Amino acid sequence: MKPSARRLYLRSRGLPGALAALLGTAAAAAWAARWLVSLPDFDHTARLPVVILGPLLAAGAIGTSLHTPSDELDRTAVRPWWPRRLAHLLAPTALAVALLALAVPGHAEAFGAPAAVRNTLGLVGVTAAAATLVGARLSWLPPTFYVGVVYLAAPSDAGGGAVWWGWATRPGPEDGAWAVAALCLAAGTALYAWRGARHVSGEA
């Protein structure tokens, strides 16, 4: 892809705005993590809201950039679109992972960088899958609904299968939570690379 065509592609998908949103999200997450830990009677476990909401906002920013201005042109293109879709999804995801890992350093055994990385990967996968079903502009809704439910309902221990259905609220090192997040990322990425985002009337 030529540089001019690459710039046009990035602008048409709104990627500059999405990248700016990722930087802002990471900065806010870093500030919130330090503030929560500094409060009296709080410790590093108080960072749970940060390792959930930070990845959720990052996934939403990435998801809204997955729209296509013209799905008809995409379908009739000479070259397959799946490599570009794959790069489009994974490049900002890698950036989000790096930024949010830096935002919550230390205490890997609880709600530190591993939990932030896992939640970013898993929620990006959920968002990518949602983009293929409801469109990129609304792709933030399903992961937001999921996060809201599990944040309120998931127990503090892993009983009752919470490590599976409440994976986003689990401490960083738990293998079961990582397995679910990896499955979400793999399924969402494959679905988006194959189908692309659903075109919804009014998207440009």
Where are these regions (language model features)?
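Secondary-structure transition/capping residues
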Residues: 84, 140-141, 197
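A generic membrane alpha-helix/interface feature
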Residues: 85-87, 96, 153-155
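Secretory targeting signals
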Residues: 34, 40-68, 89-144
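Juxtamembrane helix-loop boundaries in multi-pass membrane proteins
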Residues: 79-90
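Hydrophobic alpha-helical transmembrane segments
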Residues: 1-47, 145-146, 157, 163-204
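Transmembrane helix boundary and interhelical loop/hinge segments in multi-pass membrane proteins
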Residues: 62-77, 81
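Juxtamembrane non-transmembrane "cap" segments at the membrane-aqueous interface
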Residues: 136-158
